[in-house]
């Protein structure tokens, strides 16, 4: 029976329990589900050519043996098979392949296979998100098959394109604009058409990357303030036209700009991706409803969601088997790639600790003990206020050696090296840090040291450096280009470091400063060195 039919035929309590009942599980019950599904997955995966290749002849009999035999994996371990879409090597037949960016400057894309069972689980869990997204308390929801949703997503083959597919098969929610039309439109056109349709039909849901929904929300406010389409709207929906007129009058009286909440009353608002914490307060102010955060990705599918209180994430028990690398273990591994970090299970996490997530995709998935590249913090082990007995998590960011801005970029040391090389600029050293401005918006801060000869012979200003490096970031990383095209921002800030500063730092310390996201304390120390009198030898010459 489809989700839509269940909403009509069953009691609200039955529907809630079927989709959101995982929130009533005890920790032991959650672990039992995890273990049962993982044992099934191990048996399936171990028999596949892909599994045999990674296991190297070993045959694990249980989860403990599996964790001891199978090393932590990355996409490099699967690339040769998955990029060629060799279905015959997989644990189960994929019915769909999802695509995303791998690493700018080195690998263009990575793909992930989805089995029918994985898609069934995905559909069930996004329906749970739909119920939770409209809820204000346990068991309460407002989802209807006649609802509308503003289309703010990337289409297939990207992971967000699965949402319209899932809803199409489960519930007749109307996308604005319709998916078949939206996929052919530019981002700007899609916003304008969706907004015009929303004015006449109303908007019940909004879902997208936090950064994108913020940009779209600002655009809606500006479009609402304009007069375009007023006559058409008056003919189609006189009541909605009157509501807009009254809203504009109210805003003029209060001396403020028109906001989406003045026109629309959302039932549910969901955001995904990174940096959502930077936008949620502003989005709540714009729409009058706090966004509910979920986490979904190309490899892991939809794995966790907030609840009616919008104050922490809970993992679904049936999407992946979860392991967690403690942050100190992760740091040891980043410093020494030969070091094998230990993992803990979900019933072993500690309150207040931060972890790198490791997943094994259930239901015939390809990825096992896979490092997704995302960081979580355990807020608490149980939520007494909501009577939830499961660990509650906060999404932090990507792992420290990757800089993600607004859910778009995957900037690494390799991609920056490529940019520097292609630019031809005489940059001898750099560090890159994800920082936040006074509005809590993320940006990429590059601290660069120029060749002293170049500084003498070339009139290189910070602005010229920024412009040239931006050009090559857009060339190396398509997602970086989308930041400008979709969000209208160029997140690059440049600080020029005096020649010899890095060498002086290394001379007086037992280590080199990390190139990607070094500690703020070390950056401040580097900047302090510039104000000191020092001499350092570079290329056989002394500089001071």
Enumerate the language-model features and the residues they cover.
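Active-site diphosphate/adenylate-binding microenvironment
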Residues: 36-98, 106-120, 127-144, 158-162
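Function-critical acidic carboxylates
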Residues: 101
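Amphipathic alpha-helical surface "interface" segments used
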Residues: 60-70, 148-152, 490-495
């Amino acid at each position: 029976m489809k989700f839509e039919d269940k909403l009509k035929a069953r009691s609200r309590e039955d529907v809630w329990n079927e989709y959101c009942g995982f929130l009533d599980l005890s920790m032991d019950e959650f672990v039992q589900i995890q273990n049962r599904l993982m044992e099934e997955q191990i048996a399936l995966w171990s028999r596949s050519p892909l599994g045999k290749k990674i296991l190297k002849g070993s045959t694990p009999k249980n989860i403990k043996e599996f964790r001891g035999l199978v090393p932590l994996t990355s996409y490099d371990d699967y690339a040769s098979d998955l990029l060629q879409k060799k279905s015959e090597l997989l644990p189960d037949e994929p019915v769909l392949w999802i695509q995303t960016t791998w690493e700018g400057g080195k690998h263009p894309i990575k793909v992930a296979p989805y089995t029918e069972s994985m898609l069934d689980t995905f559909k069930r869990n996004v329906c749970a998100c739909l119920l939770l997204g409209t809820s204000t308390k346990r068991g309460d929801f407002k989802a209807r098959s006649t609802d509308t949703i503003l289309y703010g997503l990337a289409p297939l083959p990207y992971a967000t394109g699965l949402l319209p597919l899932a809803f199409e098969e489960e519930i007749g929610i109307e996308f604005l604009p319709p998916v078949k039309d939206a996929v052919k439109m530019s981002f700007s056109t899609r916003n304008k058409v969706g907004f015009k349709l929303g004015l006449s039909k109303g908007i019940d849901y909004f879902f997208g990357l936090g950064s994108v929904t913020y940009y779209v929300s600002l655009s809606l406010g500006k479009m609402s303030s304009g007069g375009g389409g007023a006559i058409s709207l008056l003919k189609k929906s006189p009541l909605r036209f009157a509501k807009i007129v009254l809203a504009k009058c109210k805003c003029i009286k209060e001396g403020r700009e028109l906001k989406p909440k003045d026109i629309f009353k959302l039932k549910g608002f969901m955001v995904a991706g990174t940096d959502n914490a930077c936008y949620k307060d502003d989005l709540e102010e714009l729409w009058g409803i706090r966004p509910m955060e979920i986490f979904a990705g190309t490899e892991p599918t939809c794995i966790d969601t907030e609840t009616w209180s919008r104050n922490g994430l809970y993992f679904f028990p049936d999407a992946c088997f979860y392991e967690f690398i403690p942050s100190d273990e992760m740091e040891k591994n980043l410093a020494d790639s030969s070091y094998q970090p230990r993992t803990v299970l979900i019933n072993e996490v500690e309150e207040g600790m931060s972890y790198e997530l490791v997943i094994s995709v259930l239901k015939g998935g390809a990825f096992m003990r896979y490092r997704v590249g995302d960081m979580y913090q355990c807020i608490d082990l149980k939520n007494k206020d909501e009577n939830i007995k499961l660990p509650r998590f906060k999404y932090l960011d990507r792992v420290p050696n990757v800089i993600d801005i607004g859910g778009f970029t995957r900037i690494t040391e390799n991609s920056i090296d490529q940019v520097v090389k292609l630019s031809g600029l005489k940059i001898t050293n750099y560090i890159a840090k994800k920082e936040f401005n006074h509005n809590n918006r993320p940006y990429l801060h590059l601290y660069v040291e120029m060749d002293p000869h170049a500084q003498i012979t070339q009139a290189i200003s910070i602005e010229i450096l920024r412009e040239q490096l931006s050009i090559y970031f857009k060339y190396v990383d398509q997602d970086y280009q989308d930041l400008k095209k979709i969000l209208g921002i160029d997140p690059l800030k440049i600080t020029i470091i005096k020649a010899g500063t890095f060498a002086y730092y290394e001379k007086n310390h037992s280590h080199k400063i990390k190139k990607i996201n070094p500690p703020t304390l070390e950056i401040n120390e580097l900047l302090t060195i510039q104000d000191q009198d020092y001499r350092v030898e570079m290329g056989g010459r002394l500089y001071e």
